[in-house]
């Protein structure tokens, strides 16, 4: 079986690492695996190739801003990708995140449809079934056509062309041989969202959870010394992972509020440090951490990991934390509560800080078998489990008539 994965990036950022992990896992299992990617440094590896240029991507970013159509244009890069597809001649093309000013998604879907190539489309975000936005939040306009988009300004669109973009995306998906297309989602919640679009619900939609690096993310046996090295005592420790602090969309203001309410609890924040006017003494900013062993140590020495995002389709911190034997509390954000281990997690309505504080206090008061938690999580979130899930989808497509 010959598989071609297509993604924005390779072996960097979340989806790039997922694609690289799958590529290595497939190769180890004797599957003929290829990757085509668009952005980032050129990678010199067998069967891995880049199809776009950084300058061209920036040009198309301007085009997207001027037209309000995010996933069109990209004529040259898309034609180069078609050439790679013809040369590889895959049994299955697996599309991941292809929304970074790099490929004309409408052309690509129509090309695969016309050529009768078996196709797997993985939704890592919502833009394929909404037509434009990665997170629709409370908006349901995408159910029947979009337009008058409440996020047009935040997406930096000069014109609100979301209705046209929605029609183009739905037309690209319409007419696929149902035995040749399978949509996968990274969480059960995202599947529920996708099935609300009638253009998607006619196809097979299968959740396949993201896999993480369980070789590094596992429970570490800690001592008081581990905490003392980063200035912590024996007080309860709450872990919070973010790309940047402060970051309103990631809910960092909720962390500030909880820290004020719970001065007896230490909050460990991993993420790039920004400018903060006032920081409670019990918030410890450790900056961005790239080393996975060190990340696993921080998860393991914490008593609980907290999630305060408004929307997440999966949430790597939830999976990583549980693999390290640390329970999770947070706001309901869609994906996290649908992929978690319920026994060790508690989620409350978004923005309800009182309930979040109660949930946090409750989890801190519980005694968990953290070794058992870690073993269950590793079994659920391993790269092997992810690869098994996708291979089952591939086999189903190969067997379909």
Regions found by a protein language model. Name each.
Residues 184, 232-250, 256-259:
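Conserved donor-binding/catalytic core segment of Leloir-type glycosyltransferases
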Residues 195, 212-229, 277-280, 399:
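Acidic anion/phosphate-binding donor-loop and adjacent secondary structure
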Residues 271-296:
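Nucleotide-activated donor-binding/catalytic signature segment of Leloir-type glycosyltransferases, i.e.
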Residues 310:
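Aromatic "clamp/platform" in nucleotide-sugar-dependent glycosyltransferases that forms part
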Residues 327-330:
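Short hydrophobic beta-strand element within catalytic cores of glycosyltransferases
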């Amino acid at each position: 079986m010959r598989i071609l994965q297509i993604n924005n990036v390779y072996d960097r950022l979340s989806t790039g690492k997922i694609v690289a992990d799958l590529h290595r896992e497939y190769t180890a299992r004797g599957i003929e695996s290829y990757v085509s990617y668009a952005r980032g440094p050129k990678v010199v590896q067998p069967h891995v190739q880049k199809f776009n240029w950084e300058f061209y991507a920036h040009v198309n970013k301007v085009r997207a801003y001027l037209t309000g159509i995010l996933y069109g244009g990209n004529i040259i890069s898309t034609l180069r990708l078609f050439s790679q597809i013809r040369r590889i001649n895959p049994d299955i093309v697996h599309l991941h995140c292809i929304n970074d000013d790099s490929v004309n998604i409408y052309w690509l879907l129509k090309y695969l449809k016309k050529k009768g190539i078996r196709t797997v489309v993985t939704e890592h975000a919502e833009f394929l079934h909404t037509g434009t936005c990665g997170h629709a939040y409370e908006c349901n306009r995408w159910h029947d056509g979009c337009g008058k988009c409440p996020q047009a300004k935040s997406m930096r669109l000069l014109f609100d062309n979301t209705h046209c973009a929605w029609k183009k995306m739905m037309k690209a998906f319409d007419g696929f041989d149902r035995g040749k297309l399978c949509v996968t989602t990274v969480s059960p919640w995202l599947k529920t969202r996708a099935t609300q679009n009638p253009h998607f619900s006619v196809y097979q939609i299968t959740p396949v959870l993201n896999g993480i690096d369980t070789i590094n993310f596992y429970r570490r046996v800690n001592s008081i010394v581990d905490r003392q090295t980063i200035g912590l005592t024996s007080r309860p420790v709450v872990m919070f992972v973010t790309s940047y602090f402060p970051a309103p969309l990631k809910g960092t203001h909720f962390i500030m509020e909880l820290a004020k309410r719970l001065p007896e609890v230490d909050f460990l924040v991993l993420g790039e440090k920004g400018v903060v006017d006032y920081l409670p003494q019990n918030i410890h900013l450790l900056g961005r951490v790239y080393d996975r062993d060190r990340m696993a140590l921080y998860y393991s020495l914490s008593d609980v990991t907290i999630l305060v995002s408004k929307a997440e389709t999966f949430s790597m911190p939830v999976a990583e934390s549980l693999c390290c034997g640390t329970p999770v509390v947070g706001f309901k954000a869609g994906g996290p509560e649908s992929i978690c281990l319920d026994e060790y997690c508690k989620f409350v309505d978004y923005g309800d800080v009182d309930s979040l504080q109660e949930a946090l206090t409750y989890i801190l008061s519980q005694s968990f078998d953290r070794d058992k938690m870690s073993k269950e999580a590793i079994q659920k979130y391993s790269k092997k489990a992810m690869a098994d899930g996708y291979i089952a989808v591939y086999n189903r497509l190969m067997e379909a008539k």
